Amino acid sequence: MTRPTVHVSLACWPGLRHDQAARHLASDVVEPLFGRLCTDHVQLVPQNFGVLTEAMVDGLMAAFPQVRFRLHANVRVLPEHHLADLSGYPAHREWFRQAARISRRLAAPAYTAHAGARRDATMAEMLEHTRRCADLFGCVVGVEGQYPAAGDAWLVSTWPEYQRLFESGVPYAIDLSHLHILACHSGVHDDALVRDMLACDRCIEVHVSANDGHGDWHQVCEQPPWWWPLLQYINPKAVVFSEGNHRRKRTP
C-alpha cells in the first residue's frame, strides 16, 4: 500500500508558542510510519501557547508563504480561554467571531472543531451549529468526532453516532486515534464505516496519532495500527495531519 501524504500539525510541538512551534517548519519533520511530513497545509492548534493574534498570523504567512495555514478546534484567539466546541456555538459567539476573522485573514480553506459536550446541544443542534459556523467562517467547516468518556459526556463518541454524522450531509474530520479509543472501549472495529467515511468527499481532514486505547495521548505513530490498511481509501481532497508529539514520548 502506498502511504498517504501526511501534513504537519503544530500539535506536534505542544506547549510552545505558535511562532516557536512554526520554526520547526523550516526543517524536515520525519516520523517512523509516515516518513517526511508535508508542509503544504499546517494546522494551528490549541496545544500551543499564547494568543494567536492578527499580527502573529501575518508574521507566519510572511515567514512561510508556501504554507496554507488553517485553524483547528478552540485554538486560543482571545486573551481569555474558551472551550469553544460546536455544541456550544451559541455560548461562544465572541470566540467564533474572532476565530472567523483569523481564519479569513489566513485565507484558510477549512476549519474543523470537536462536536463537543452533550450537555450543550443535541446531535441535531450541533450539526446545525456547524452549518451556521461555515456561514460565519466563509469556508468549509467540519465536525471532528470524539470517543467514549466518563458520564457519556461527548457527542459523536459511539459507532451509531459516527454513522449519523456520516449520513447528515455535514463535512467532517476523522481522527483515527479517537476511533482507536472507541474500538478498544466498545470491542468493535467498524472497518466498513471507517472506510466509507474516509472515502467520502465530505471527509475534509484525517488526523493520525497513537495511543493505548485508553486516552488521547497524541503520540507519534511508530507501528501500523489496525486502521493502517484503511488509509488507502482516503478521498484525494482530504488533508491528513499528524498530531503526534515530537517533543516528548509518553512512558507506560
Where are these regions (language model features)?
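Distinct, well-ordered alpha-helical segments
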Residues: A21-R23, S27, E54-D58, A121-R132, ...
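Conserved beta-strand positions in the central sheet of alpha/beta enzyme cores
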Residues: H41-V45, T112, G142, A173, ...
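Histidine-acidic metal/acid-base catalytic patches
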Residues: T2-L10, D19, P32-L33, R93, ...
